Amino acid sequence: MKKAAKLVAASVITTLALGSLSAPVAALEAITDTLSVDFSQTTGSFRGGATGTLYGFGDEGAPTQALINGAAITNTSQKAPHGTQHPSGDALKVEDGFFQKHGKDMYIYIQDYYPDWSYHGGVRPADTRTYNQATGAYSNEPNGIWDYLEVVEFVTEAVATGSSRPKDYVFIPFNEPDGGNWYANWSTMKATFLADWKAIYTKIQEVYARHNLGHARIGGPGDTRWQPARSADILTFAKANGVLPDIFIWHELGIDNLRTFRSHFAEYRQLEKDLGLGPIPINITEYGMLRDMGTPGQLVQWLSIMEDLKVDGQTAYWNYAGNFNDNSARTNSANAGWWMYKWYGDLAGSQTVKVTPPALNTVDTLQGIGAIDTKNRRATVLYGGGSGGAVSLKLAGLSSFGTKVDIEVRENTLSGAEGVAGTPPVIKALKGVRVVNGTVELEVPTYDRYAGYQVIVTPEQDRTLEAGKVWAASVEAENTNLTAATVYTQDPLSGGGWKFLASGGRDVGSFNQPTSKADWTVSVPRDGKYRFQIIGATPGTPGRHALFVDNVMASPVQYTANLALTSYQKWQYRGSAEVTIPLTAGQHTLSLRASADGTTLLPNSDITLDKFLLTDVTDGEPTVYPASTLRYAGGAAVTYGVAQARGHGSIRGAGQRADVYAQAWETGYYDISVDYRTTAAAKVGIRVNGRAVTQLSAPRLGVWRSTARVHLVQGINELELSSANGILLQQVTTTRAASADSAAVVVEAENAVRHGTAVVNTYTPASGSNASGLKGAGYIGNGAGNTIEVPRGPGFDKPGEYNVVVSYANAELSGAHDYNPQVVDRRLNITETGSTTPAGHAYFRYTYAWNSFLERTIPVTLHTSTGSLVFGNPTAFAPDLDKLTIAPTTLGTPTTIPRTRIPQS
């Protein structure tokens, strides 16, 4: 292979690093791994089913629709309708959000109808009850029918009559029957299990038949692990009796399963052949350990195996429902795991290709997925894991892209389970790289083995590529100058996988003395505003630190509470805190301290520290989403056939659409700028988070930039672009316009008019609470009269569409479980006096403590000019409220200016 193709030697290459962003010491000392990808050797259609979840959905809107659609989750297992195993996760309540765009298969755990784990005390029910099939109520009297068969009928009937997509359900009669759930002793329970399987299979089909729904899909057996002998017995019986599962299910839980998974799959497929069965689809409905969740370099190892084998899989449910099993953050934000899900979902419509890693069937190694999208002419590699050193990529089979290609490499580093990860930055931008015999080689430095990487290769585009567009730097907390603190090694193999991983493999703890501090000396390029982000874990309470710059107090740092109900959550379930500070160009020492005065500890300041990040936000942190990276629907696609528009997205006509998943660090106003070309006058419609908010326009043929000022919510925002007349889209850019936030109206909840039981809550300074003014409102709801009321005033005194940003707390738990926090998502309704149409509502997820507040945005449509906004819930308690921010969805009139040159990305 000619070395001229190596990117490190080619003169046409632009490689721009992100400021002083540096890898951990361990990563710098590691060896280089090689990953080979041949895009000419396809291995099948991209399946996309490896990012399924177990109880990843909590309630309607928890997670939000933007998170759901962006993650492109195709399958999930949820609670049986009316089940009592967990307070949330009912399949019927979450199906609309799941099926909206990418959802295909809704699985339900029928046994989760029972409240206890193991189910029914771990003992198979007998006939001691009589169930009312209309209501699910039962009396403690036998009726000649096996009790569980009555439960199966009731659950199946609920799906058949209550779901809008009953044919897309998969019923799982048994969950881990080889464990503590009724059939563990195969020598004594085999005959019973087989008879029960047949009876349940038959009953489910009977229910669907009476509703003319055709064949109901059934999955099983659902064992705790691959069980070859049990599986052989079950399949032999099922074949003979005409009750074969439609989906074959088992679990892969543990560290070593990364080594053994492929062999289990091979044994199963051989068993099918031995029994004369055609291949049955497989779903590993529980896989992975805590150490894998939210960690791109771990997740990609699982995803690569499943995509290679073309099986579906669902991450295990180790904590609480509604956050994709620790693969999203806060109420609407991405962590690093979510971005890996999103990247994986971006491969839809592609063909996967041959990938050769350093080793297969080995725990914690460099692994990857390669795919080629021939319609959009995009070749992608996703990879992570390995030694933590640089990765040498050998990319072959690119001849169809021509003699030159563009390459962008994006980096996605570990941010903690609850820590916010921004849009992954471009760390290498490589323009016009010469392709030699269809091959290109490049070397990419690796932050650490837990990071994930996306490499996108396209034919040469008509845009300027740029890495490090926004200056940023980071440092591992353990690599700062520490005083009165301890560095702890977080071994990824310890505890059997029951631990969350730390960036760089270490973190800082025992940060509990008045003299405790972590000093980071860093140079910034210019005078301006900078966001300082700390990734760390609070022990179940909100807390505070003080940030000093050059030994002068610059800002308090406020942390929200993190999950800390168990030993493997406390100090390890890491979130993030962000503050914005002014800095002058040059070197500064940023000092994070447990005390503001050196003698008195700040409230709950004993917080573990993992990583610090510093980002230049002076210019609003413009974030570019190029057309070559977007998702397209309805026939829209990237085109390379138009001069001066190579790599642009062609969007024309009804149904055609480009989807952008734009990240916002804070709720507020942003300028959404669209760069595009037109052949005549054209309009561009923009929907934000499911709502049409604005329309851009170009007057004639030309090259244009149109900009609209739109209120975005903290976290992920789904932008959908369409054009009836047709445009060639180059890119979408979001830029923070913080000065416009003055258009929003802020109302402290304690200052609203209270009705019924609603009271003012007061939080002591010692609590560490992040409540604004240390006050809020509580005991709202659980009765129609228990509300707070906000009279209309300037800023929201006209009918129209608004966002209501709710700062809230919800720490309600219901019942107990061996390891799952039994969280309750609380609902808040907004009504408008004088209008019969509800203004809006949302469910509010768990915040870990009653004095720790997150924010959730409710889109509302107001129909009057004077009607007060009333907040409550007539049937259950609403969350406690801190403050309410009411903002028009857009400001001003969109602008369009001609462009005489191609704007830089």
Each model region followed by its residue ranges:
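Substrate-binding cleft and catalytic face of glycoside hydrolase catalytic domains
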Residues: 71-245, 249-255
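C-terminal beta-sandwich/jelly-roll accessory domains of carbohydrate-active enzymes
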Residues: 385-482, 553, 836, 844-846
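Secretory targeting and sorting signals
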Residues: 1-27
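Boundary/entry segment of secreted carbohydrate-active catalytic domains
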Residues: 30-81
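Carbohydrate-binding surface patches
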Residues: 362-416, 459-460, 535, 663-666, ...
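Extracytoplasmic
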Residues: 463-904
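Aromatic/acidic polysaccharide-binding cleft in carbohydrate-active enzymes
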Residues: 289-377
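Glycoside hydrolase catalytic-domain groove-lining segments
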Residues: 246, 250-295
